[in-house]
């Protein structure tokens, strides 16, 4: 709905800015994080917020919201691959198997769209880049959360994300305020619900079980993308998509079970 009034630059900025205000009101105390760590917080603000938020908003100009959510469900694959290849984190062979079956489920859900091959354009590519960006950010943020806590880490990362989104917005677009009639409620929902509450919950999960194990919860995103796409946007869900969703749920459960 927000795309009816706002462009991708504006959506990216407002959802980060609203989330930043919300989280900073939750914790008004001064955060003492060494300046040497701020480059990593800035990376998180860029790779977890400013860049993927813009990419997903831009992608949904040409693909359905359901398809964008389904592609987002591939994020755990990239988190695991990047953790294994770049950050040398170990996962068992059986966990690799469940990641593969989870990806298979996402594949089935994606190809359940009758027009998937037509949709596989620049929008799908941008959504895939956003998922890869999440993969790097999740691995970078894990030690920050361990050392400084989930709330403090998110608080500063959102500040950097808002700053970088504003820098990208000013030369490329204009500062149009969301209106009550069209985009204000969607932006409040994205800002408070997603950038605020959901990210804080996910950061706490990363603190408890790590980026790889915590990322398996992202497999739930395609489920709600399909459901909400059908309810609010009348996007079609086929039988093969339901089969794919079932595989995703089973894979997520088994992966978490083995991790525990």
Q: For each predicted feature, which ranges?
A:
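Hydrophobic/small/kink-forming positions within alpha-helical transmembrane segments
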Residues: 46-50, 54, 77-81, 107, ...
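Helix-helix packing/entry segments at the starts of transmembrane helices
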Residues: 13-14, 53, 67-74, 140-163, ...
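Specific transmembrane alpha-helical segments of multi-pass solute transporters/efflux pumps
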Residues: 24-72, 108, 191-209
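Helix-capping/transition residues at the boundaries of transmembrane alpha-helices
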Residues: 3-4, 60, 87, 145, ...
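Hydrophobic alpha-helical transmembrane segments of multi-pass integral membrane proteins
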Residues: 7-25, 43, 94-104, 122-129, ...
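A helix-boundary/kink motif common to multi-pass secondary transporters
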Residues: 7-8, 64, 87-91, 149-150, ...
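Hydrophobic transmembrane alpha-helices of multi-pass small-molecule transport proteins
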Residues: 23, 82, 91-113, 131, ...
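Membrane-interface helix termini and inter-helical loops of multi-pass transporters
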Residues: 1-5, 61, 65, 110-122, ...
């Amino acid at each position: 709905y927000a795309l009816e009034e706002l462009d991708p630059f504006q959506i990216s900025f407002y959802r980060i800015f609203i989330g930043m205000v919300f989280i900073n009101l939750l914790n008004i105390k001064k955060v003492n994080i060494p300046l040497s760590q701020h480059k990593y917080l800035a990376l998180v603000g860029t790779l977890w917020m400013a860049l993927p938020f813009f990419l997903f908003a831009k992608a949904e100009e040409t693909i359905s919201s359901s398809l964008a959510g389904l592609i987002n469900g591939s994020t755990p694959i990239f988190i695991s691959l990047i953790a294994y290849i770049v950050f040398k984190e170990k996962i068992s062979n059986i966990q690799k198997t469940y990641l593969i079956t989870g990806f298979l489920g996402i594949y089935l859900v994606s190809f359940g769209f009758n027009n998937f091959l037509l949709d596989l354009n620049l929008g799908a590519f941008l959504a895939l880049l956003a998922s890869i960006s999440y993969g790097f950010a999740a691995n970078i943020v894990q030690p920050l959360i361990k050392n400084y806590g989930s709330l403090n880490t998110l608080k500063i990362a959102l500040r950097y994300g808002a700053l970088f989104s504003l820098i990208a917005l000013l030369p490329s677009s204009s500062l149009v305020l969301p209106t009550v009639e069209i985009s204000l409620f969607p932006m409040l929902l994205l800002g408070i619900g997603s950038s605020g509450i959901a990210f804080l919950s996910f950061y706490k999960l990363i603190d408890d079980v790590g980026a790889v194990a915590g990322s398996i919860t992202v497999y739930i995103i395609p489920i709600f993308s399909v459901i909400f796409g059908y309810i609010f946007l009348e996007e079609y869900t086929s039988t093969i998509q339901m089969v794919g969703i079932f595989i995703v749920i089973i894979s997520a459960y088994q992966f978490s079970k083995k991790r525990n």
